[in-house]
């Protein structure tokens, strides 16, 4: 049985997947896990760019979701992405962070998309 934290994470990941699909991306894989790290979402843009997405979901306005993605987390993401890419053909890659803050009162949400976090978010 899933914990409340896992359920909240799944809601956020579904919202983010929908966000990418609406922008014309294809979903490649979800929840790829390795002993040293995980990839929440892997998508591909129409130009062939493979994007590795970290999704952070929070309720309310407490500690910032984006700030919770540390250098250590990005290192684990890169390592997982390198493993996932082995034996695959790809053009360009990018790392994005997408935060979802859900209002516990209304159920509404705010989604912030930070593209290319290794190069400085755009």
UniProtKB/Swiss-Prot annotation:
Gene3D superfamilies the UniProt entry points to: 3.40.1350.10
- Give a single Pfam family match: UPF0102
Q: Which CDD domains match?
A: PoNe_Nuclease (cd20736)
Instruction: Spell out the molecular function terms from Gene Ontology.
Output: nucleic acid binding
- What is stated as this protein's family in its record? Belongs to the UPF0102 family.
PANTHER family on file = UPF0102 PROTEIN YRAN
Q: What is this protein called?
A: UPF0102 protein CE1920
């Amino acid at each position: 049985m899933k914990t409340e934290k896992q359920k909240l994470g799944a809601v956020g990941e579904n919202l983010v997947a929908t966000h990418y699909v609406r922008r014309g991306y294809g979903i490649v894989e979800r929840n790829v896990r390795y002993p040293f790290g995980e990839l929440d979402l892997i998508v591909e843009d129409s130009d062939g760019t493979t994007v590795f997405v970290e999704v952070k979901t929070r309720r309310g306005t407490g500690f910032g979701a984006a700030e919770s993605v540390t250098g250590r987390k990005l290192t684990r993401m890169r390592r997982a992405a390198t493993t996932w890419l082995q034996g695959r053909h790809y053009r360009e890659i990018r790392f994005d962070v997408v935060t979802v803050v859900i209002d516990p009162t209304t159920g509404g949400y705010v989604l912030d998309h930070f593209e290319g976090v290794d190069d400085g978010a755009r």
